[in-house]
Amino acid sequence: MTHAILIKSFPKDFGWLSYCLKSIHKFAKGFSEVVVIIPEGSDLPLTAERLIKISEPGNSATSVTNHGTGYTYQQIVKMNADKYTACDYVVHLDSDCILTRPVTPDDLMVDGKPLWLMTPFKDILSTDKNLGAHVESMRHFSGIDPEFEYMRRHSQMIPRWAYQCFRNYVFERHNLSFESWALAQKFRGVTEFNFLGQFLHREFPNFIHFHDTTYGIPDSYVMQSWSWDGITPEIRDKMEKILA
């Protein structure tokens, strides 16, 4: 089995991305490739990663403008990850995340299945005002009241076959590609890994190890920041110490 680490980034996050890549070089072992997807016209210093440059929709896509340029499109790219790597499994990692200790593909699996954390909405809705939007968008997307939130932390390993199955489901339900459906949604109308997690939990529960965090949270190997806040001196110092 082969495993790719996939990062969708853009120029504003390249400062974060440099730390993310340094952490991968330091701590990631046993992965076949690292794929960094960036917009056409942007550039990065030469690295060991395979860079893929893609065109992104412009201001004609109203929902993209409302989200900030490219926000919805990066969600679309992630749900098409199988088009950017031939590996059997894809590990999604955001630019503003760094690995904090050695990690291998086996660390992301339980009994040979990708580990996927989920938390009952009833336990967390009162703690985060944004989660209500996730419930509404998941209900609108699937027609089913969601029981769990599936975007608990980075990173997330997903089998290659799951992306095409998911896109087929979207077309069967909405008669639209995932891209067309997503770009037509309002602000916070797309929560891609919640959509995919809910779908896989319902249709393929025996192929993913879904873990209810009510029964404990496995140790994390990722430090996740909030890129919109910028790299503060405190965060920079913390990342530098981890990567020293």
State the predicted function of each range:
Residues 39-84:
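Active-site-proximal specificity loops/subdomain of glycosyltransferases
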